[in-house]
Every structure is written in structure tokens, then in C-alpha cells.
Design a protein with these regions (language model features):
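Short hydrophobic alpha-helices and adjacent helix-cap/hinge residues
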Residues: 2, 20-253
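Bacterial N-terminal signal peptides
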Residues: 7-17
């Protein structure tokens, strides 16, 4: 994906200018990352973006902004994103690059017009909204959908004696989309595992005590496998049940 992603950026800048001569222009690029500056791999993403543009012969000033998603409410995220867009507008930004679902989702739902006026390149989108892409011809990039059929199958094969799969979520839009994807996958493969069942637990809709009792204590956790379609702060607890997820953010907890 990395081999394809950064040539795509160079191509977009070439289309914008009609030529790709670094001596003629320096482009202003806004890179919006979904989580905090302290997330371990974020500096690597910024470095790779810089290297990719440099290899493509593009001279660019890259400004990296951090949304700090999962810490703020969605309304607060939108406020932060509007501030990010206003700063980008003042810098006369030529291109926006986003990393992961939260950055792109908030960018397109914050109410600012900037993402509709200049090219946007997305990366790491696990739950793409095709309707958004259809009405935004200025958006391009790559998605990285999770194959939950494979993830669920691996979870059951690794822990065959654990018969209860718990899909853990909160009430956020992306988390609920992840739950739907897990449920659809389970419908496809559950006939292979007739002794297993999948149940959904929402940490914002159900008593935390009951959830903690189910998956955090040895005397109950032995029969559970936790499926986390989207990483949530609750999962930073010391769970006794194994957790299967597809987000790099899980590796920081």
C-alpha cells in the first residue's frame, strides 16, 4: 500500500499544477492524524509522507495536526477540526491527507467547506462510507477493510474451548459500524461453529459492572473471547479474556 499511496500524492499535486517541478512551487500539505501526538507510529507516518513526496520530486511544507479522537466527544472533535481547517485555510493549504477513519469522518462532518474545495487523500479507512466518496470527487486514496470472517475464525480456532464471543463497543458511529460488520461476518461463518455464540455488549448502554464481571475476572472470563471492531478506552483495562482487534491503537495499551 505504501508503494502506491505516495505516488498517488505526487500525481495529485501534478494534476493541480500541470507540472511537477520542485523549483517552481512549494506545496502546503495538511496531514491530519486521528489520535494523539504520543501515539507511537504517528511520527513514522509523517516521516513516510515526507519521504514519499520527496521521492516523487515534490517540494512540500507538511503541517501535521492531531485530532486526539476517542478522548473528546464528537461535538468537540468537530470544533477541533474546524479550527484545524481554519488554520489550514490561512496557510493556503493545497492538499489534505488523513490517516484512519476518525480524521476523515470528522473532517467531512465538521461543517467546514475546506475538504470540499481542495484534494483530499485518505489512508487507513476501515469503514468507508461510499455515499461520502460519491459526492466528493476530490477524494482519493486507499481503504483497509478488516476481514472479520478471518478474524473470527482465527479467534475460535485459537481458543476452541471458549464458546462465547463478546463484541465490545461503545455508541460512537464508527464503533457501531464495526459491530454491524462483525455481526454480518458471524452470520456467514456461524454454521461452522454451532456450539459458539456471539453477543454484543455496549459499554455505554449496559452496566459496566456486568461487563467487567464477564470479561475481567478469571471465574467468568475463561469462557469468553473479546472481539473489538474499534478500539475503545475500556479495553485498556486488564482483561482476562483474549482480545482480537484490527487497530494498531491496541498495541499501545
Amino acid at each position: 500500500m505504501k508503494r502506491l499511496f505516495f505516488p498517488l500524492l505526487a500525481g495529485l499535486l501534478w494534476l493541480m499544477s500541470g507540472t511537477l517541478s520542485a523549483t517552481e512551487r512549494t506545496y502546503n500539505v495538511l496531514f491530519i492524524q486521528s489520535y494523539t501526538k504520543n501515539t507511537p507510529w504517528h511520527s513514522l507516518l509523517t516521516e513516510n509522507l515526507e519521504n514519499g513526496l520527496d521521492k516523487g520530486g515534490v517540494k512540500a511544507n507538511i503541517t501535521t495536526e492531531y485530532l486526539n479522537a476517542d478522548y473528546w466527544s464528537f461535538a468537540s472533535e468537530c470544533f477541533i477540526m474546524r479550527r484545524i481547517c481554519e488554520r489550514a485555510r490561512q496557510r493556503k493549504t493545497d492538499l489534505i491527507v488523513t490517516s484512519s477513519d476518525e480524521a476523515f469522518f470528522t473532517l467531512t462532518h465538521c461543517g467546514d467547506s475546506l475538504p470540499y474545495q481542495i484534494p483530499v487523500v485518505v489512508s487507513g479507512i476501515k469503514y468507508p462510507d461510499e455515499r461520502v466518496f460519491e459526492r466528493m470527487p476530490n477524494v482519493s486514496g486507499y481503504v483497509s477493510k478488516t476481514d472479520f470472517d478471518v478474524l473470527l475464525d482465527a479467534a475460535v480456532r485459537m481458543f476452541p474451548s471458549r464458546r462465547e464471543l463478546v463484541c465490545l463497543s461503545d455508541s460512537s458511529f464508527l464503533s457501531l459500524k464495526g459491530v454491524k460488520a462483525v455481526e454480518e461476518s458471524w452470520e456467514r461463518i456461524k454454521s461452522n461453529y454451532p456450539e459458539h455464540e456471539l453477543k454484543v455488549l455496549n459499554v455505554q448502554a449496559k452496566s459496566l459492572n456486568s461487563i467487567i464481571t464477564s470479561i475481567c475476572y478469571d471465574y467468568n472470563a475463561y469462557k469468553h473471547i473479546v472481539i473489538a471492531p474499534k478500539w475503545i478506552p475500556f479495553l485498556s483495562l486488564k482483561l482476562k479474556a483474549p482480545v482480537f482487534t484490527s487497530q494498531n491503537l491496541a498495541m499501545t495499551n
